[in-house]
A protein has these predicted regions:
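Extracytoplasmic/lumenal ectodomains and periplasmic regions of secretory and membrane proteins
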Residues: 556-602
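Extended amphipathic alpha-helical coiled-coil/heptad-repeat regions
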Residues: 349, 368-380, 384-391, 399, ...
Length: 660
């Protein structure tokens, strides 16, 4: 090979190497792995916002047509006389046919109306040990003129046909092994009630009973029997017991009730198929622990009317026609923790009507047909570290005409698979969200329709990450990932966003309906991957913002106004697109860097001296350049090796071909 050929081949090899390098860089640039010096790569980010107008407001009396019977229409009746009048106001019973057994410290009185018909004394029992028990009462009644009022029908099974009322200071036990089941005839004025007294149910089954059918009464609209304790010093304990098919819609007759000033506990008990599973009204320091509230006609567990100091821990509420657990009308100073409320017809856990200063923590609330956790007309509620999944609405906070909702704290909750995640509306004030994670929301991650602060909340996989409407909200450290839209502002709202990370498919931040957004703070807000980084038809004040891997950086509508300070926008197509007339007088751009195929489209900026506008190659141009470089490489490689073959054969005689 001649010297000339060697030089030629070396030169061609150098050109080929250079072409390969250029093509490689072009491919890397097209993939976003490498950028020319002076460009920037924004950090990963995410943010979301949904249109609140699409978010339903679940009715608090919601009933499901799947998996739940229709909740009975409330037909409240007022019992006259009440179950307590035999002790408190016997004159009210005058002339009535209602019968009851009044339990006193020394014995019992049988009564019809206000008239005593018979008296029995416990000391007459052959084996009386000083304790008042259901079997002792039955033993006395057996010697009365009305022995069928309470009798043992089978071993351990007792049938009660009238009311039992305990007088103040008495303690009555209904307990295994002597009592296995208490059947209460499904007639009006059949009950077990205590006035400033104690009732203990241990290891027993208590239910309504229809002698004609030899079965419990399944109809919650009937005047079914109930259990209720009331008065200063009253106590009701239910331990390892089952209460079913009890309750009617009358004051403290809902099933099993802890009334005014009553304390006590429910441990490892089951409340099912009652009107309300269990109820408290003005009760004090009652504990419900490791119990089950299921398939009740209205509520599972209903603390009510100024009850206070309650502990609701380790329970399960499911299959109830409305709410699983509801605090209503001034229930305060209580804790709901480590419960599982699921598959109820309305809300899983609810605070209602001034039920304030309560704690809801470490619960699992799932598959309810309304809200998972609802704070309605209640204040100073701490909602912390709950798992809320598969509900119509995950967590909602709202005021109404019955009470304001103020200074509620929603912190560290895990929400997933809800139609909407968190919603704040209806006059709620000073709500604070922090460190919540909202995943796989069908519609919107968070809807903030009242002034709210959000600190380090995360939305993953939603149609809209965060929807801000009305008032002024602040979002700090927000992260939105794998969502179509990041933050949407509407209805004249004002929002401040700082240090957000918005990784969206369609729009990073959408400002419309005369809304105003301010991006500020020491930490950079980053918008990544969106078709449009920022769409403005209201007012946008941007400071310390980065947009990267977006098709268009900022789209300014004819009604929009824009101010950018220290912005960094790297777009594939357009850095700033100005729609309509008079763009320059609606834009203030200072100390910013716009890099795009077309840095500014639709208007001329009045002053660009402090900004850096860089036109870059489009992805189509990069692809074309890469194709040309590869074609050149193939051509050069062909030129490098093809001449060697031609030199080898030049001047060499061709071999002769012999004939056939």
């Amino acid at each position: 090979m001649s010297q000339q050929h060697r030089v030629r081949r070396a030169a061609l090899a150098m050109v080929a190497v250079a072409a390969v390098a250029c093509a490689t860089l072009g491919v890397l640039a097209g993939l976003g792995v490498w950028k020319p010096q002076g460009s920037f790569v924004g950090s990963w980010s995410a943010a979301t916002n949904p249109l609140a107008s699409t978010v339903p407001n679940p009715a608090d009396s919601f009933t499901s047509d799947v998996g739940h019977d229709k909740a009975p229409h409330r037909q409240r009746v007022r019992m006259q006389p009440s179950q307590f009048d035999a002790v408190a106001s016997p004159k009210k019973l005058r002339g009535t046919p209602w019968a009851n057994i009044t339990v006193q410290a020394d014995g019992i009185r049988t009564m019809i109306g206000n008239r005593i018909t018979w008296i029995g004394y416990f000391r007459s029992l052959p084996h009386y040990d000083g304790n008042i028990s259901l079997e002792n009462i039955s033993g006395l009644i057996a010697d009365s003129p009305t022995p069928d009022w309470l009798r043992e029908t089978d071993p351990g099974v007792f049938l009660l046909k009238v009311g039992i009322v305990q007088s103040p200071g008495t303690t009555m036990t209904v307990a295994a092994p002597r009592v296995q089941e208490l059947r209460m005839a499904a007639n009006p004025y059949v009950y077990v009630a205590g006035v400033s007294s104690t009732g203990i149910f241990r290891g027993v089954k208590v239910t309504s009973w229809l002698p004609a059918t030899n079965a419990p009464d399944p109809d919650p609209l009937h005047r079914r029997p109930f259990i209720s304790y009331d008065g200063v010093g009253a106590r009701l304990d239910t331990i390892d017991s089952d209460f079913s098919f009890l309750g009617s819609d009358s004051s403290e007759a809902y099933g099993v009730s802890w009334g005014t000033n009553t304390t006590g506990q429910s441990l490892r008990s089951v409340f099912h198929d009652n009107l309300f599973g269990a109820y408290t009204g003005r009760a004090v320091n009652v504990t419900f622990q490791n119990s089950v509230f299921r398939n009740n006609a209205v509520y599972g567990l209903d603390p009510h009317s100024d009850s206070r100091g309650l502990t609701i821990i380790g329970n399960e509420a499911y299959g109830n026609n409305t709410h699983g657990i509801i605090f209503s009308k001034g229930v305060v100073g209580s804790v709901i923790a480590n419960n599982h409320s699921h598959d109820n017809g309305a809300n899983g856990i609810m605070m209602d009507e001034l039920s304030s200063n309560n704690v809801i923590q470490n619960n699992v609330v799932e598959r309810n047909h309304g809200g998972g956790i609802v704070i309605q007309g209640s204040s100073n509620v701490q909602v912390t570290n709950n798992v809320v999944a598969g509900n119509t609405l995950g967590i909602r906070v709202n005021g109404n005409e019955l009470g304001i909702a103020a200074t509620n704290r929603i912190t560290g909750n895990q929400l997933s698979g809800n139609y909407n995640g968190i919603k704040v509306y209806g006059g709620a004030r000073d709500t604070a969200l922090a460190h919540n994670v909202v995943r796989d929301t069908v519609n919107t991650g968070m809807v903030l329709s009242e002034p709210t602060t959000s600190q380090s909340d995360t939305v993953i996989n939603a149609q809209k990450g965060v929807m801000v409407r009305h008032g002024a909200s602040t979002l700090t450290g927000l992260s939105v990932q794998q969502s179509a839209r990041g933050v949407v502002l509407a209805d004249g709202t004002t929002a401040t966003i700082a240090g957000a990370q918005l990784d969206t498919r369609d729009v990073g931040i959408d400002v419309h309906d005369a809304a105003t957004v301010t991006l500020a703070g020491a930490n950079t807000t980053t918008i990544t991957g969106a078709r449009k980084g920022l769409v403005v038809s209201g007012m946008a004040n941007l400071s310390n913002v980065t947009m990267d891997k977006v098709a268009k950086g900022v789209v300014l509508s004819p009604a929009g106004r824009l101010s950018v300070e220290d912005g960094r926008i790297a777009a594939q197509d357009v850095g700033l697109e100005v729609q309509g007339l008079g763009g320059s007088d609606r834009i203030v751009l200072h100390n910013s860097d716009l890099r795009a195929t077309d840095p500014v489209a639709g208007a001329s900026l009045a002053d660009v001296s402090s900004n850096k506008l860089t036109a870059t190659m489009s992805w189509l141009a990069i692809a074309g350049a890469t194709f040309v470089a590869l074609a050149l490489i193939l051509h050069l490689l062909h030129r490098m090796f093809a001449p060697m073959s031609s030199v080898r054969h030049r001047g060499t005689p061709q071999p002769a071909h012999s004939g056939a």
